[in-house]
């Protein structure tokens, strides 16, 4: 380790710098939190919880006042319309007014328990005015909307978000603004406020402002402020932008979170949300020594910025190359400057609105990507001042590992993966070079060739690769035009590594499971056909499950052209075969319990029917999704039996309001707990009826969520176990550098043969006995119950064959 080569003074300097970084991280995160909070105080989580309890508490009192007013015979005619908003909204609007005018950050740090109401508190008059203004605006808007419904519906085609400003403009345009005198507003607002003052939520204090002048100041009670302050304090660190570490992270322990040096900014080792009032220990998954050792080993991996890639990436970004998915650095060409067609037809105006919305939507996405790239490159520049850095990790409740910072992480996107490599160069070997060539060919979309063919492809293209390294700006063969999972800069990093002349290597070589979720299901159900298609069983060349499903889907469409008007159109568009990319995402996710909605979502997101006119695209998405679902159903028959079994067990256990718990072979105990969510729709729907929903967790389990989530979570827990069991054996072999992303394993090229052997051995270890049987036995023993028998499987299946499968992880 490079850390061990530092002297005591150098170690202290880096540790001190890390402490300063963490203090700055905390300070800037807190400032960012309060800045965001101040933009919409009433939408803060603590304030939402306050509103929830306040509305429940105050609504009966407002209703009592409404009933009393309605019983009277001398009520002014202007009052009844204002009462139409209802008691709950009255309570909500009143408390929101106090939040808006009273709450500041300093309120939570200087609570005066002696005098109660600070002199900086707003007056009852100002709060009353805000209450009445809001209620009147809402009532006027609702009247206008009801009276001019056709106009409102027509404008809604162009206005996606009816903001308060637009609502007021609509009301004014329709001429439905009812005027109220200052006295009427004051009377109404003061009545609303007096009811709230009768509770222990807010309080008032009379202060003298001078000669014969006094004012009633309004604030929340000290106890309410104290509770709000506690909740804000717990949320402040959530706005921190984490970064890598300059010194080794603090190791995780079974009962102690590790990672950053400062305990108050560490993320929980296993993140889990717990119902209010419940003991978190009853809901936490539990790591084993094997998992902890692996997690800490990943954190101890030393990384460095790849300076060659950084130079190219930053040059291209700041010079607006806008290739390889790089966002624009400047936005001079992004303004939607075409003027609105005032004299055009309704169709032309609607088209302009649609194009304008789409253009500015793309601008917003680009602006986000631009901001993120600026942060990424700034962080890379900072880390380049140091020879190496570390990345803390945490776990989810299934045992999967995640970096705390996506930027400059092996779990990040192409930019981040390409910008880093292992910090310490080691001597390259003949086998390491072979794996580097295979890795390079994979990145250049040659991963369906045999290994020898991939090596040959690289050898045949070495002149191109050398030209790329010499001038990557002009020679752009490394640039991909893919919108998603674009590998361009990883290609560039591989080219730089291939052309090294110092005999050393630093680039992580990745080996990806061939649809790892399906690989696990093929082994669990002993499905020979599926095992062959996912390279669990040996073959002379890599098999392609995605293309197989695509071919099945194509055959279904070809054989059933009379069943759908869309099938002939699909066959005309994809003349010879359905591209594998159309089936890839759905096939990849099927092992995790894919729904028909999920298939439609992926078809739409990945643009597989973008060639269809917009007005027809919805139908195309549905029909292509149906065909894909039928294609998958014929391939995944046996895994579907396993998923059905898991869901049946989830249904039975959830009926007893007990969590699903199982232990994987890594020793990790999974607590599969989805609690019912208690939601409250905000009564401040105000103008546009947009629902502001906030929630708390109930101690009761959500049976539907338990049912739906068990299939993906079960498989994810076992792929996590596979990863940590592999890392455990690699540590015994002396390997200390890991670039692992769930089912993509990476290390130095010279160590790949060892890693390849070990990941197969651990897969055999897991599947020698049936994970479904282990799941069943654990639950039966824990709850002293008898569960249904697991589905039958083909026992004439030798799982040790995977040891000979060359393309199991390719």
Where are each of the predicted segments found?
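Short glycine/threonine-rich loop-to-helix capping motif typified by GTGT followed
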Residues: 750-755
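Non-catalytic nucleic-acid-binding interfaces of large nucleic-acid enzymes and RNP effectors
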Residues: 1-587, 593-713, 720, 725, ...
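Conserved short loop/turn motifs at secondary-structure junctions
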Residues: 587-589, 605, 742-748
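Ordered, soluble secondary-structure elements with a strong preference for glycine-centered loop motifs
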Residues: 717, 749
């Amino acid at each position: 380790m490079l850390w061990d080569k530092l002297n005591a003074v150098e170690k202290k300097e880096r540790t001190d710098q890390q402490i300063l970084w963490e203090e700055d991280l905390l300070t800037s995160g807190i400032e960012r939190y309060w800045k965001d909070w101040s933009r919409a105080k009433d939408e803060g989580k603590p304030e939402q919880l306050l509103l929830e309890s306040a509305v429940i508490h105050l609504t009966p009192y407002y209703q009592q006042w409404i009933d009393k007013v309605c019983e009277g015979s001398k009520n002014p005619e202007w009052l009844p319309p204002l009462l139409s908003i209802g008691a709950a909204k009255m309570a909500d609007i009143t408390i929101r007014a106090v939040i808006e005018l009273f709450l500041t950050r300093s309120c939570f740090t200087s609570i005066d328990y002696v005098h109660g109401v600070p002199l900086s508190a707003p007056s009852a008059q100002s709060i009353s005015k805000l209450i009445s203004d809001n209620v009147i605006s809402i009532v006027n808007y609702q009247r206008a909307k009801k009276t001019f419904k056709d106009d409102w519906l027509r404008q809604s085609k162009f206005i996606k978000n009816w903001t308060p400003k637009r609502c007021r403009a609509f009301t004014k345009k329709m001429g439905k603004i009812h005027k109220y005198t200052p006295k009427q507003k004051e009377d109404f607002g003061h009545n609303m406020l007096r009811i709230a003052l009768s509770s222990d939520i807010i309080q008032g204090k009379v202060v003298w402002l001078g000669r014969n002048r006094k004012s009633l100041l309004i604030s929340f009670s000290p106890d309410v402020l104290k509770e709000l302050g506690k909740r804000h304090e717990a949320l402040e660190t959530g706005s921190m932008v984490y970064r890598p570490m300059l010194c080794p992270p603090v190791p995780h322990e079974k009962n102690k979170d590790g990672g950053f040096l400062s305990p108050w900014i560490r993320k929980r080792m296993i993140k889990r949300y717990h119902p209010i009032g419940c003991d978190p220990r009853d809901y936490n998954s539990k790591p084993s020594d094997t998992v902890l050792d692996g997690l800490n080993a990943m954190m101890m991996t030393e990384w460095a910025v790849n300076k060659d890639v950084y130079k190219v990436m930053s040059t291209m970004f700041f010079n607006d190359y806008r290739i390889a998915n790089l966002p624009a650095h400047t936005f001079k060409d992004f303004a939607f400057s075409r003027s609105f067609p005032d004299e055009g037809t309704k169709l032309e105006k609607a088209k302009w609105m649609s194009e304008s919305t789409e253009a500015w939507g793309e601008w917003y996405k680009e602006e986000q990507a631009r901001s993120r790239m600026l942060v990424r490159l700034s962080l890379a520049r900072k880390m380049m001042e140091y020879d190496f850095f570390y990345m803390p990790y945490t776990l989810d409740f299934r045992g999967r590992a995640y970096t705390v910072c996506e930027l400059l992480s092996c779990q990040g996107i192409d930019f981040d993966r390409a910008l880093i490599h292992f910090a310490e160069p080691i001597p390259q070997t003949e086998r390491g070079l072979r794996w580097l060539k295979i890795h390079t060919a994979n990145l250049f979309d040659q991963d369906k060739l045999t290994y020898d063919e991939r090596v040959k492809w690289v050898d045949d293209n070495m002149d191109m690769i050398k030209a790329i390294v010499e001038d990557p700006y002009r020679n752009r063969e490394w640039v991909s035009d893919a919108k998603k999972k674009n590998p361009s800069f990883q290609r560039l990093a591989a080219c730089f590594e291939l052309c090294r002349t110092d005999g050393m290597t630093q680039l992580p070589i990745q080996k990806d499971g061939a649809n790892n979720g399906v690989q696990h299901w093929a082994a669990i159900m002993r499905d020979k056909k599926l095992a062959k298609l996912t390279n669990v069983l040996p073959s002379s060349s890599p098999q392609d499950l995605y293309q197989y499903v695509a071919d099945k889907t194509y055959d279904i469409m070809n054989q059933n052209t009379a069943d759908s008007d869309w099938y002939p159109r699909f066959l005309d568009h994809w003349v010879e075969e359905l591209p594998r990319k159309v089936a890839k995402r759905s096939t990849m996710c099927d092992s995790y319990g894919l729904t028909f909605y999920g298939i439609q979502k992926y078809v739409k997101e990945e643009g597989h029917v973008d060639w269809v006119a917009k007005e027809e695209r919805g139908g195309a998405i549905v029909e292509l999704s149906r065909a894909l679902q039928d294609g998958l159903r014929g391939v995944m028959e046996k895994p579907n039996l396993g998923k059905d079994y898991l869901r049946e067990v989830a249904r039975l256990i959830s009926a007893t309001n007990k969590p699903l718990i199982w232990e994987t072979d890594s020793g990790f105990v999974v607590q599969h707990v989805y609690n019912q969510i208690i939601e409250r729709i905000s009564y401040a729907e105000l103008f546009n009826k947009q629902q502001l929903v906030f929630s708390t967790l109930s101690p009761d389990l959500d049976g539907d969520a338990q049912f739906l989530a068990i299939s993906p979570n079960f498989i994810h827990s076992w792929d996590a176990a596979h990863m940590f069991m592999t890392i455990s054996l690699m540590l015994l072999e002396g390997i200390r550098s890991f670039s692992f992303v769930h089912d993509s394993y990476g290390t130095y090229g010279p160590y790949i043969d060892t890693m390849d052997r070990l990941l197969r051995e651990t897969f055999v270890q897991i599947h020698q006995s049936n994970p479904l049987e282990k799941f069943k036995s654990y639950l039966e023993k824990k709850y002293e119950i008898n569960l249904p028998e697991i589905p039958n499987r083909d026992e004439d299946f030798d799982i040790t064959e995977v040891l000979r499968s060359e393309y199991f992880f390719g």
